[in-house]
Amino acid sequence: MTIQLTDEQLMIRDMVRDFAREVVAPEAAERDHSKKFPGDILKQMGELGLMGMMIPPEYGGSGADTVSYVLALSEIAAACASTAVVMSVQNSIVCESLLHYGTEAQKERFLKPLAQGDRIGAFALTEPDAGSDPVS
């Protein structure tokens, strides 16, 4: 199967690659070593439309397709795996769940600040009587 990237997908990939190399990568090892949360970088990523990529524009997102999202995530991951995990959870678990399963009031209240990087979502998992280990 051959996938031909569109001009827009290539533009997104290149923009994120430049951002990742110039902003994310330079202090990635130090952030990981010191366990510093990359809040300032995530805010910049929100301003670039990377924190709610597949969320429709009417909710503050970029309205990007899945291929564009994966290309962007791959470029962030190449620069810093932990920053990519935050981006992935924000886009895939938090924003997508709200978009598909949230009420209209929840979408209006939460999606725009999440998609624009003003708020960071979280993932929690419980399994009664079984324990949970989402890392493994």
Where are these predicted regions, by residue range?
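Glycine-rich flavin
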Residues: V23-S136
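A non-catalytic, amphipathic alpha-helix used as a structural packing/dimerization or gating element
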Residues: M11-E22
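Intrinsic disorder at enzyme termini
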Residues: M1-L10
